[in-house]
């Protein structure tokens, strides 16, 4: 008996998204000859219909940047929104989700920010925090969520075992990595992160023998900043 070949995940998901668009939104896909892509101006059609208006207003209200390929069927930003935004006003469901991921007692979900209609939201998206923890913000003004600064794909807050916790979510779909860091980016990255990368000032063990530049390879670069 021979093993069946494992289908390429990216190719498989392209086919699935193309079939989905053809069935649910006939005639809308096909941007640049790809059946799994919508025209950029139709990015909201890539969202769950129940959250399209909500997402548009939330992004506008908070001046959040849409990813360049938000109209792509394999957009991880859109995938994250489709899964988590419908739960933003359902702390009971989010509590069970957090418990299943982290274990422990059922947490009490805490408000992250207000939604477009002024209601409490228990999930935030493209989150940059309230202070310039990573030395990334512009000299004047606030950073733009989702662009040019580290932005968590989603954030949740909860209380569990008497402690308040913040959970940052890094959402992936079909991303791949392999290209080396660009040398021209190294000086600025060192300025930002060198003093805050290693314990006791950062998340990386200081006795592991790592150099700051070794953290600039993806996907480790994203993970250590969050």
Task: Give residue ranges: language-model regions.
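Acidic, metal/cofactor-coordinating or nucleic-acid-engaging core segments within structured domains
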Residues: 174-226
């Amino acid at each position: 008996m021979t093993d069946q070949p494992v289908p390429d995940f990216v190719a498989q998901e392209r086919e699935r998204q193309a079939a989905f668009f053809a069935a649910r939104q006939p005639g809308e896909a096909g941007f640049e000859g790809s059946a799994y892509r919508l025209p950029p101006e139709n990015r909201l059609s890539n969202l769950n219909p129940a959250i399209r208006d909500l997402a548009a207003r939330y992004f506008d209200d908070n001046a959040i940047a849409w990813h360049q390929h938000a109209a792509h069927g394999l957009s991880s930003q859109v995938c994250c929104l489709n899964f988590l935004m419908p739960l933003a006003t359902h702390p009971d469901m989010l509590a069970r989700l957090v418990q299943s991921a982290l274990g422990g007692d059922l947490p009490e979900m805490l408000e992250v920010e207000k939604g477009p209609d002024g209601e409490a939201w228990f999930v935030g998206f493209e989150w940059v925090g309230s202070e310039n923890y990573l030395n990334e913000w512009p000299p004047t003004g606030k950073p733009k969520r989702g662009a040019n600064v580290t932005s968590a794909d989603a954030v949740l807050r909860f209380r569990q075992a008497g402690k308040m916790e913040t959970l940052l979510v890094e959402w992936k779909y079909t991303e791949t990595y392999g290209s080396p860091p660009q040398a021209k980016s190294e000086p600025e990255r060192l300025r930002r992160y060198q003093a805050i990368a290693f314990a006791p000032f950062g998340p990386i063990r200081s006795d592991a023998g790592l150099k700051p530049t070794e953290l600039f390879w993806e996907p480790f670069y994203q993970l250590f900043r969050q």
